[in-house]
Amino acid sequence: MNKCKENRELSWLKFNDRVLMQAKDNKVPLGEKLSFISIFQSNLDEFFMVRIGSLYDQMLFYPSSKDNKTGMTGEEQLKACLRRITYLNKKKDRIYQSIMDELKTHGWGIVKYRDLKNKEDRKYFESYFEREILPLISPQVISKRQPFPFLNNREVYVVVQLESKKGKRKMGIVSCANAMDERMIAIPSMQGKFILIEDIILHFISNIFSKYTIKNKGFIRVTRSADIDEDDHSLEGHEDYREMMETLIKQRRKLCPIRLEVSQIGRAHV
């Protein structure tokens, strides 16, 4: 590796680190700090889709190809990026938690469903789930004999380990996307407090898969590669540039996954 020159991918991650540091700046208002966390995460998603996807393809198909500035192979760049991303994610989690702690002192925050103590609040969200969420979701039960369903890019899914009355294990999956017109719902008895839609779905998941016993549950989120070659031979014959770009966009949606995020509670069975 040429130590006199900075790798493009690592340089970009340093830029995103500077974005993250804005969320730690005491001169920045609390609401804007959360915006910088969101920008950091959106940037990182895009980095995975485009740059990590490209490095992964380079590692597979052109393993001896090297970066002309640093002399790093695709595999070396990929490993260096993933080490840096692990560090940045831990840093982001610490900063986010400090922001949430500060918001709490001002009476604002996100509450887990399991921490709701007020019976009227619980009745409200049970009714909200039945009325506003349940009609919009499409649960799927997956067995070993069935192909795994296609997971859309950057969508949050609830996954559950199911057990039938005969003791057979299956997996259930529910996309939260259709129910997410508003991701946060205000808690009636707690001014400034909110609950996430996906947390409501997770809590009432036994109502969705009522014929099964829930053995484990959690969240997953897939990020798909967006690295597609505009010179791909499959695009030959497209005289209309707009039509060609529409084809490219459709292909991007179905490229291979390059990241799987799993909640702590779901890791045991995913």
Annotate each language-model stretch with its function:
Residues 1-267:
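N-terminal non-catalytic structural scaffold regions of very large proteins
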